[in-house]
Swiss-Prot record:
Keyword line: Cytoplasm, Elongation factor, GTP-binding, Nucleotide-binding, Protein biosynthesis
Keyword Nucleotide-binding belongs to the record: yes
Protein name, per record: Elongation factor G
GO cellular component: cytoplasm
InterPro entries (alphabetical): EFG_II, EFG_III, EFG_III/V, EFG_IV, EFG_V, EFG_V-like, EFTu-like_2, G_TR_CS
Annotated binding of GTP, by residue: 19-26, 83-87, 137-140
GO BP terms: ribosome disassembly
Amino acid sequence: MALDVLTDLTKVRNIGIMAHIDAGKTTTTERILFYTGVNYKIGETHDGASTTDWMEQEQERGITITSAAVTCFWNGTQINIIDTPGHVDFTVEVERSLRVLDGAVAVFDGKEGVEPQSETVWRQADKYDVPRICFVNKMDKLGADFYFTVDTIVGRLGARPLVLQLPIGAENDFIGVVDLVEMRALVWPADSKGDTTMGAKYEVQEIPADLREKADEYRAKLIETVAETDDALLEKFFAGEELTVAEIKAGIRKLTVASEIYPVLCGSAFKNRGVQPMLDAVVDYLPSPLDVPAVEGHSVKDEEETITRAPDSSAPFAALAYKIATHPFFGKLIYVRVYSGKVTPGTQVINATKGKKERIGKLFQMHANKENPVDEATAGHIYAFIGLKDVTTGDTLSDIANPVVLESMTFPDPVIEVAIEPKTKGDQEKLSTAIQKLAEEDPTFQVMLDQETGQTVIKGMGELHLDILVDRMRREFKVEANVGKPQVAYRETIRRKVEKVEYVHKKQTGGSGQFAKVQMTFEPLDTAEGELYEFVNSVTGGRIPREYIPSVDHGIQDAMQAGVLAGYPLVGVKATLLDGAYHEVDSSEMAFKIAGSMVLKEGVRRADPVLLEPLMDVEVRTPEEYMGDVIGDLNSRRGHIQSMQDASGVKVVRALVPLSELFGYIGDLRSKTQGRAVYSMQFDSYAEVPRNVAEEIIKKTRGE
């Protein structure tokens, strides 16, 4: 069985399960594993027993933080599933998994429809062009509305859903689905508690009379959409002939793989209804590794030279390391997607990103945190490798004779930070180890040493992100430490252009001295477009020898780590080196580096420096009677209301609010709405801090 799959990639699906937090993603994954025979007992998220939530904190909090990889089989097809987190603080995990997937199942809450994080994850999937099917979950929930959810897929995502199923019954009476492809009803036992097969058995019945008209209407839309994919089908359609089930499925597959439509199915994973037809849809409609374009990379010697690697086991080996985890026995586990070629344990490969040779130890296919050893890793599959020394997320492993660098991943900068202080000298050593390991695993976790206070500062994507990292330091690395209050990661930038800023670095002490003269122009860049720094060399006629130019650049970049206003990192600066002078004996790389640092500080002081703060896109769902209080509160937090809409019995308010005003917001929101409102937030952009607020921040950081 497994051997066939290794050679026949049409029988492989690499998929992700993506959604908003609490839409039922992990429960859906658990059901998939149960029905495919990997699990003999269903693990419930609310019991803290699910297979893919294998870290202690995940089991306590009932949320998924790391994207565990699980392999299972359904109808002769191998499905490699990555269960991705829905919480906004863990977007890096989502981004990583989408980079290596071929398709995804987007899970929506049947009552809430498209929620903010569903939208974020959907846009991330758009970025990597990942074909998707939609599963409207929680159809048994009070207020669940399948048709409303389909409308939000159009309204909020701008996507084109293709409805393949209709729900039979709603809320407590939800018992099954109408299959519009084969025009039949699939009905599960009414009492799921008394069902000893846990939903594994269901009956095929006639479509209920009260749904017949609606089923015909949606079936007609489905057939019309499918007929447009092929001239022969279109002729058949216009001639009034019936399309066969095979023709309909082939048409849906073609449209899904091209991301032109998104098939929509429904069910209740918790009540064990609708999961098997969704698995059928994964096999029938989502792409195999052969359906997606060959992966692109570039030559090691020339970034402009594009190289492609087709999913073929006889081609040169190429794989992308997309995640690193620490295993209690094996140490570092490197999760990889093999794009081409194959390797066996003991093979030497090159880390093309770093130019270093590595020897692969053991190979595993993972089932959450259980590992199944394999004899070779082949194209189109996902594995965990051990024994690699110097590999980080986004590195390419490739054949030594045919190296290639695959497109890596870009990760957002952290927006929040806390100071962490070990309690004893022993804790200091443990903290260093913990930080190194955690930073290897998570590219959005950054660490710096505050030069003034000597404190270690850790940075992340949100309060929950940092909470969990600190928690892991305590549990896994036994670090006892005092943790400060969360602080906002401010930045500094400049608002106007300053020309011909000069600095002369001159030092004369016995023997050779130091000399470097530079003249520069500094101007603002558009940080909203991601332009953080640019260096241009316009020196002519050898006024500064070529070997000293990079030193000026390095000096500027060093000085940008701490801005002139309050010591926050400086961004959005274009630095142009115009002129300068050097001394045959006294000039050195160090002298020009110091001159670069000092000229930047001088230039920035004259370029109208300002403070920037992270703005969060906040969405609040509140009953109508609290709407006024919610809006008033957001305004008092310097928020700008962006929109107000209705959604299934509640009002949805979206606003841009500075992160600094949102600490403790959840408690205030609960008390203002008697615990009935919920909110979510995600990073939107950096914006200038109003002058009066900036003055307070600057005074505080200077200790005035």
